[in-house]
Curated annotation (Swiss-Prot):
Main location class: cytoplasm
Gene (UniProt): Gpcpd1
Listed GO CC annotations: cytoplasm; cytosol
InterPro entries reported in the protein's UniProt record: Carb-bd-like_fold, CBM20, CBM20_GPCPD1, GDPD, GP_PDE_dom, Ig-like_fold, PLC-like_Pdiesterase_TIM-brl
SMART domains the record matches: CBM_2 (SM01065)
Compartments in which it is found: Cytoplasm, Cytosol
Protein name per UniProt: Glycerophosphocholine phosphodiesterase GPCPD1
Domain GP-PDE: 321-621
Protein function: May be involved in the negative regulation of skeletal muscle differentiation, independently of its glycerophosphocholine phosphodiesterase activity.
SUPFAM superfamilies: PLC-like phosphodiesterases, Starch-binding domain-like
Modified residues (Phosphotyrosine): Y611
Entry annotated with the keyword Phosphoprotein: yes
Length: 675
């Protein structure tokens, strides 16, 4: 095939060590794999921007799609191997740039990085080969800093974190792999402050750091290629620098220092935990107190290369509020009016889908042998047989994580509510149903393969939560390693999702953070109960109120929040507040089962409503995605124009309008399948 020499040009400014690169749909552009992308070369400065170019041979007459990103190219791990690529920012327009070269030589001036067809759409990258360390200081359980000296008893403290790499002897290497390839990645540090009112992200700190406040979450994010080779130094200062200041000190108000070697975290073998570090005085180097440092380690998803072909992490197409089937056809165990189909089974999910549910919501966690299973509770009841008893049936509560997938399929298991049932034997017989789609504990892979792709999945990732009183969900104070747990679930979804619409959600803020950092395709919503009279308050400060949940979602750059209906009915302004911040908002809770409440919530402007027994309110019908697909076909095929099937107008009221604050790509939305 005749080649065409295409010169791609883009303008933009970079940080030291960064380059622009191009990635696209053909071999020459890496087949959407950023590791095989082509780096652009700096040509000359033009005003406030710099011109970057790359000359690439493409097949003449063949259409090619592509995107630009900025990041770092690092030396290969092995001789002759591919470069390690770190993506900092990339273009995520729903429709990528495209070209069909028809001449032997052509120059493509793509203007400013991130702007395509007049619309700027950029998103942050994900972890490709680097590790992210998060260190947090907060008052969720107790004040993070405790100093024993009397003169500091009433002091408030400021903290500054300094990041240093441990010294290593390095050979001088004057032979560069290329002008765009770095020998090593520079460690990065970002400081974040999250509260009800706002969030702040900074790459620099005041000389005396930031103040610790009871209502504020302070977080330090470090990206590094050497997670076990860092020295992290916390310096503590008095909040009120007008008192206890020793004249002539280099750092007025300096109280003491705590040091953490990242190897301590690495050697613990844990993805999350709490470390207590001694605080040493500024002069005598005696221990004067301690600091509690909450940490998580986020590792890249192993054995899976994320594609740049498309991303929905921050994309939401404006529609009327979507109906989402709670646990499929509804709660069948603990609510006032139980669903007629057992919850979280394929039959239940299929029932909701057949009644027009746009999405079905269900819960996923792992069996003992690391198989992702669909089940709501962290524990279940195992049937025990007693000897020499008139009633041989006894129920024993056991964590789901203690049973293998085969055991979950073969053993006679009951929901924990069976413990409260007077006739336990009868409750067991009622649950017995050998039709496979009615069986509890289907695997996530089985569910992905069984339901039609036009049904969206809202996958809630289960994790243990601690209540403010110290009690843990399911009385489980320990659980799986968070990285291993998520890697298995995410790979199962990414490898089996096809073209299905998927939205993740979780009550655990760290799960939301990790899902965002480990993959670039699917969005996640932060589940929050806010202020509730129904449920006990959670320990995590980020879960306490709906406003701080919004601030967290903004800080993590996730799609939005899934708020408790009880809190939204009490504070309707939260809905528009979330939208003004560019967030999508779903709602959940028993109050959503009331049709009058659903009417109010739709008027408020929520994007999705999760509720039980959709079959009670909607007849068997196609969902909105199927109707939209039919509308597209009608436009493309004239013979379908007179079809009497439901149309989009059946779902869209006259008052419907586009929400300008939600990330929406206006270019060719309807031509992208399953957007």
């Amino acid at each position: 095939m005749t080649p065409s020499q295409v010169t791609f040009e883009i303008r933009g400014t970079l940080l030291p060590g960064e380059v622009f690169a191009i990635c696209g749909s053909c071999d020459a552009l890496g087949n959407w794999n950023p590791q095989n992308a082509v780096a652009l070369i700096n040509e000359n400065e033009t005003g406030d921007s710099v011109l970057w170019k790359a000359v690439i041979a493409l097949n003449r007459g063949v259409s090619v799609k592509y995107r630009y990103f900025r990041g770092c190219f690092l030396e290969p791990k092995t001789i002759g191997g591919p470069c390690q690529v770190i993506v900092h920012k990339w273009e995520t327009h729903l429709q990528p740039r495209s070209i069909t070269p028809l001449e032997s030589e052509i120059i493509i001036d793509d203007g400013q990085f991130g702007i395509h067809n007049g619309v700027e759409t950029l998103d942050s990258g994900w972890l490709t080969c680097q590790t992210e360390i998060r260190l947090r200081l907060h008052f969720s359980e107790k004040p993070p800093v405790s100093i024993s000296k009397k003169k500091f008893k009433k002091s408030r403290f400021r903290v500054k974190l300094t990041l240093e790499g441990l010294e290593e002897d390095e050979d001088d290497d004057d032979d560069k792999v290329s002008p765009t390839v770095l020998h090593k990645m520079s460690n990065s540090l970002e400081i974040s402050l999250i509260s009800d009112n706002e969030f702040k992200c900074r790459h620099s700190q005041p000389e005396c750091g930031y103040g610790l406040q009871p209502d504020r979450w302070t977080e330090y994010s470090i990206q590094t290629m050497e997670p076990d080779n860092l020295e992290l130094i916390f310096d503590f200062f008095e909040e009120d620098l007008s008192e206890h200041v020793v004249q002539g000190d280099v750092l007025p108000g300096h109280v003491g220092t705590a040091c953490l070697l990242s190897s301590t975290i690495a050697e613990s073998g844990r993805s999350a935990g709490i470390l207590t570090l001694p605080i040493m005085s500024r002069n005598s180097r005696k221990t004067i107190g301690k600091v509690r440092v909450d940490f998580i380690i986020i590792k890249p998803l192993p054995g899976y290369s994320c594609s740049m072909q498309s991303s929905f992490s921050k994309y939401w197409k404006p529609r009327i509020p979507l109906d989402v089937g709670h646990r499929g056809a509804g709660n069948s165990t603990t609510t006032a009016k139980l669903a007629k189909v057992q919850e979280n089974t394929i039959a239940s999910l299929r029932n909701a889908a057949s009644h027009g549910a746009a999405f079905v919501e269900f819960d996923v966690h792992l069996s003992k042998d690391f198989v992702p299973v669909v089940y709501h509770d962290l524990t279940c009841c195992l049937t025990m047989k007693r000897k020499y008893e008139a009633d041989p049936v006894e129920l024993f509560e056991i964590p789901v994580k203690e049973l293998t997938f085969d055991q979950l399929q073969l053993l006679k298991l009951s929901h924990v509510t069976a413990l409260k049932t007077k006739d336990r034997k009868q409750s067991l017989y009622e649950e017995e149903n050998f039709f496979s789609e009615n069986q509890p504990f289907p695997s996530l892979k089985m569910v992905l393969e069984s339901l039609p792709e036009n049904v969206g999945f809202n996958i809630e990732i289960k994790w243990i939560c601690q209540h403010r009183d110290g009690v843990w969900d399911g009385n489980l104070s320990t659980y799986f390693d968070m990285n291993v747990f998520l890697d298995i679930i995410l790979k199962t979804v990414l490898e089996n999702s096809g073209k299905r619409r998927i939205v993740f959600s979780s009550f655990d803020a760290d799960i939301c953070t990790m899902v965002r950092q480990k993959q670039n395709k699917y969005p996640i919503l932060f589940l929050t109960q806010g202020k509730s009279d129904i449920y006990p308050e959670l320990m995590d400060l980020r879960s306490r109120t709906t406003p701080i949940a919004m601030s967290f979602a903004q800080f993590e750059n996730i799609l939005g929040i899934n708020a408790h209906t009880e809190d939204l009915l009490r504070n309707p302004s939260y809905v528009q507040e979330a939208k003004a911040k560019g967030l999508v908002i779903f709602c959940w809770g028993d109050d959503t089962n009331d049709p009058e409440n659903r009417r109010k919530l739709k008027e408020f402007g929520v994007n999705g409503l999760i509720y039980d027994r959709i079959y009670d309110w909607m007849p068997e019908q196609p969902n909105i995605f199927q109707v939209e697909q039919l509308e597209r076909l009608k436009q493309e095929l004239p013979e379908l124009k007179n079809c009497l099937c439901p149309t989009v107008s059946h779902f869209i009221p006259s008052s419907f309008c586009v929400e300008p604050d939600i990330h929406v790509d206006a270019n060719g939305i309807d031509s992208v399948e399953n957007a």
